[in-house]
């Protein structure tokens, strides 16, 4: 049979669990957790693609970014600098702090034409 836990032991266990949850919550909110993503990556420029400058998320485009969380700002700037598209900051009740806008790329024309099939003559 298991020994009954005293209320002091149960309170101590509950306190430790709550402290651990609070620590994890602070780490997530502060953006301290490093996911190993290199934010200094260079993006290859495609030929024929116009170069666009995306506005800084912290500027408050249309007043949208003024109430954005620091985590959203920290995710917006490196993401917008490492992709081919750009992002539009927005105020959303669903947690979408910015929307991706990706360029529509036209397929490359085929420069190598396949030769027509010729019948084999057996004589």
From Swiss-Prot:
One GO cellular component term noted in the UniProt record for this chain: SOSS complex
Family: Belongs to the SOSS-C family.
Biological process according to GO: DNA repair
Record lineage: Eukaryota, Metazoa, Ecdysozoa, Arthropoda, Hexapoda
Name under which the protein is recorded: SOSS complex subunit C homolog
InterPro entries (alphabetical): SOSSC (IPR031821)
Pfam family, one: SOSSC
Source species of the chain: Drosophila ananassae
Superkingdom as given in the UniProt entry: Eukaryota
